[in-house]
Design a protein with these regions (language model features):
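N-terminal amphipathic alpha-helix/helix-capping segment at the start of soluble metabolic enzymes
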Residues: 1-37
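Glycine-rich phosphate-binding active-site loops on the catalytic face of alpha/beta enzymes
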Residues: 23, 99-109, 141-153, 178-216
């Protein structure tokens, strides 16, 4: 499988990808400890994407943080994605951008980012999945499959919606929402291509980030 259809940037995929983690940043990034942890986590060779998602940060700080993260992602051959903001993604020359339903229009984002990766959140809606297919996105994010501490869950997704989406498209599916050690395998077995993970890695009270990701076999 390819990460792109009809002109969007591609990534090779296995039936169950060894690099199945779509890693999302913590809500705040301060100090050098995060960057040390990030190097170790990406070196695990389990991560395909890293998304920079900082909701309450200035553009200036986003660019400063993004430049540092981009170097680490490049070192470990991880695709660097910016959340919500195609303009920042372009300024950083990131690999792509992730868009929510209330963010910039996909076609407008494509004009800015050209052939870069553009993924979109479709919550639990097959109607939104079909629109994403028509818009020729790079990947489709579905969820939340489980409750999450990262953000309030407005849309609850089921394994059924994942199965239905897989039947109508070959565009890779990213499962999101509360994914951790106790529930991740069910999503992979139901053919989610990537798992978006954040709190389990960065806010785990039992394991440090490297140990947490190594637990995901």
């Amino acid at each position: 499988m390819q990460l792109k259809e009809n002109g969007q940037k591609s990534l090779k995929q296995n039936n169950i990808n060894k690099r199945f983690v779509y890693l999302i940043s913590p809500n705040k990034i301060k100090g050098n400890e995060f960057y040390i942890d990030l190097e170790q986590v990406l070196n695990s060779k389990k991560v395909s994407f890293f998304q920079l998602r900082l909701k309450n940060e200035t553009n200036r700080n986003m660019i400063s943080i993004g430049k540092r993260i981009k170097k680490i992602c490049k070192k470990y051959k991880v695709k660097f994605i910016i959340n919500d903001n195609p303009i920042i993604a372009k300024k950083l020359n990131a690999d792509g951008c992730h868009l929510g339903q209330n963010d910039m229009n996909i076609l407008k984002a494509k004009k800015i980012l050209k052939n870069k990766i553009i993924g979109v959140t479709c919550h639990n809606s097959l109607k939104l999945v079909q629109k994403a297919i028509n818009d020729k996105v790079s990947y489709i994010a579905l969820g939340a499959f489980y409750s999450t501490k990262t953000k309030k869950v407005k849309y609850k997704a089921s394994i059924k919606i994942l199965n239905l989406a897989k039947k109508i498209t070959n565009i890779p599916i990213v499962a999101i929402g509360g994914i951790k050690l106790g529930n991740y395998k069910k999503l992979l077995l139901n053919k989610a291509n990537f798992l978006a993970i954040s709190s389990y890695i960065w806010n785990n009270k039992k394991y440090k980030p490297l140990k947490a990701i190594l637990k995901l076999k």
